[in-house]
């Protein structure tokens, strides 16, 4: 089957959001009626096609993922501009069990894997940036280079947003303090919101199964993109009650439910079971999506 890159990327984002994290799941879903209808394809890209898609990725695609993140953030902010953003700096261990490039023993976590830097918005939970690092890296290794593009983006594109940087003691370095002061950013070294748990368990950021380090870095970006799209969906269109629920609960109520796909001459209709207990939760977001005013340019 011939497949170009954008449809495969979209397929992987939908799969990750639905809880299918591995390339192999593509073969199981290839004839799934809902996936085929949403992607407008007669069949999904197969596991070998998906794996080749990832293996073609390089440093340039990493930069493109950052550009995609910035473009989407601008569109989300056109709907709901924040008054303040808390830049939550953190690091975590992505466990790796093979012979991946950059896999190493981390003495803090006492395990092998990668040790990425992450930056979330501590108010909304948006993942602003994630960067894969070798497993043996210290928490603060490369933090100023990691942070500067974020500060540049907010200071140039969103000058009215008040920035506060927050991190734990692992980031207590004079270089970071100086960087914040030179960029007019308040900072505090303290405990922070923990959004990493849902990122790792709900979106499997640890799916770093390729041997090549750059390929794994790109894989993480795809999972990060899926996380952010879900987080924006949760924040902008779910009800206040549903907004507090984690991805596993939302999957159970809105995604992993029985439906009948009906094809007509002009439309594809998804019919819910008459006894579906979450009909209201399902239809409310559809109505809210129709009311969004997104600035596309």
Question: In which residue ranges do the predicted regions lie?
Answer:
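Anion-binding and metal-coordination hotspots
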Residues: 1-297
């Amino acid at each position: 089957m011939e497949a170009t890159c954008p449809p495969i990327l979209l397929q992987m984002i939908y799969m990750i959001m639905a809880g299918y994290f591995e390339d192999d799941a593509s073969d199981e879903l290839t004839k799934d009626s809902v996936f085929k209808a949403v992607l407008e394809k007669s069949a999904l890209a197969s596991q070998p096609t998906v794996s080749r898609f990832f293996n073609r990725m390089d440093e340039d695609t990493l930069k493109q993922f950052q550009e995609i993140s910035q473009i989407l953030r601008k569109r989300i902010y056109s709907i709901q501009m924040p008054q303040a953003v808390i830049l939550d700096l953190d690091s975590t261990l992505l466990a790796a069990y093979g012979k991946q490039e950059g896999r190493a023993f981390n003495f803090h976590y006492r395990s092998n894997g990668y040790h990425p830097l992450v930056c979330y918005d501590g108010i909304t939970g948006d993942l602003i940036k994630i960067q894969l690092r070798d497993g043996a890296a210290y928490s603060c290794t490369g933090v100023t280079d990691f942070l500067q593009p974020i500060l540049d983006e907010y200071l140039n594109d969103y000058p009215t947003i008040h920035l506060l940087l927050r991190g734990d003691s692992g980031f207590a370095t004079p270089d970071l303090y100086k960087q914040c002061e030179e960029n007019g950013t308040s900072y505090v070294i303290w405990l922070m919101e923990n959004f990493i748990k849902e990122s790792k368990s709900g979106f499997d950021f640890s799916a770093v199964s390729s041997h090549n380090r750059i390929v794994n870095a790109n894989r993480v970006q795809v999972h990060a993109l899926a996380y952010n799209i879900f987080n924006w969906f949760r924040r902008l269109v779910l009800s206040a009650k549903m907004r507090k629920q984690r991805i596993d609960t939302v999957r159970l109520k809105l995604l992993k439910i029985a439906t009948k796909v009906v094809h007509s001459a002009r439309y594809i209709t998804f019919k819910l079971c008459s006894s579906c207990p979450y009909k209201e939760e399902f239809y409310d977001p559809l109505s809210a999506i129709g009311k969004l005013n997104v600035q596309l340019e």
